[in-house]
Amino acid sequence: MTSIALNVRATQTLIDDYVAQAKLVTGKSTDPQIVISPYRFNPLGAHIDHQGGQVLARCVNQYTILCFWPSDSSRSSLHANLENGEWQSTQFSTSELEDEYGWDLMARASVTVLADFAHTEQGFDAVVFGTMVSCGLSSSASVILAYLTALADVNNIELHAQDLVELSRRVENDYRGLNNGVQDQMSIVFGQQQSISLLDVEAVSARHIADPDEMDQCRFLMCYSGVSRNLTGSLFNLRVAECRAAAQLLYAQADHLGQVPLKLRNFERIGALPDLLARRAKHVYGEMERVGLGATAWMDGDIAQFGELMNQSCHSSIHNYESGSEWLIALHDIAREIPGVYGNRFSGGGYGGCLFMLVDKDRTAGIAAQLMKSYIGRYPELRGIAKVLLADSEGTVRLVKS
């Protein structure tokens, strides 16, 4: 058995397979249009986008792939192969939202927010595929962006990057009930291959920092813990509220910690906060500093420094922000002891999903084998579920022809 799972790429072979499945389930004979929407991870910038902080982001070679055709009316239909392996189907029109949260909520909400943004007359018949759903890679942002891109295409609506980010945010905030910021959407919308994006979440803009020459000798690896996540059932919203409470104690006019004036962010004032709120503020302000240092390290090709900042970030997420799950904390601790791992941190909110590692390219196979041996030794029930994959860089969400 290999230590690194088969790598995924949006190759023509993968697309052809999904197109064939889409035609079979819909009964259509014509070729569909296709949206490829990659997933993302953030090596630095955890839990601070909703606090006005900048974020370092990178798209990764896991995907939402949406095959679609214009429908015959304003109604849309959607088919999905869910985790249990069974096909599910639904049909809906604009504003047809169900009271209960369902697998198709994000598609229904995407139709609704786009109709609020611009005049729409055309629905789609679509089939959606996801390579790693609910693994802390922002598959939700990825699939929402895919829906919006397809719906805009069939209605001849031009969406700029900022439009995609804002409409996707509305789906997450207004319909999924998450109080998250926009780093997930921005990470994908502004994604660029062979680079890291420095995201300014307040300005909704990005600066791309090209991979340094030193990355020729390094790789990003990702390890799926075997335990999926769902932010709507996590402590995500509570943490956002705690950060807001800390901000208002530091500066009454602040809605989040990023709005607290710099002169009021000193050690003494933060230390005077209630312990829990002080730790939340320490994480946010420390992570803001690490993002700046990380951007400089990436530009300078200082891989060791960048990796150490990832370690510090993950440590703060665990101890100051208190977001790590049992399995991800175990992976983090194991990875820190493996030679050739420059740094690691878990992805997403840390409530389940994946760990990302920056590693020595020549030691990739050995690192993967050692990590899995130790991890499965602790959690034998996850054998055959947990896996290590190469995390190659990807670009932005895009429309392609089959």
List each model region and its residues:
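Structural signature of FAD isoalloxazine-binding scaffolds in flavoprotein oxidoreductases
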Residues: Q54-S73
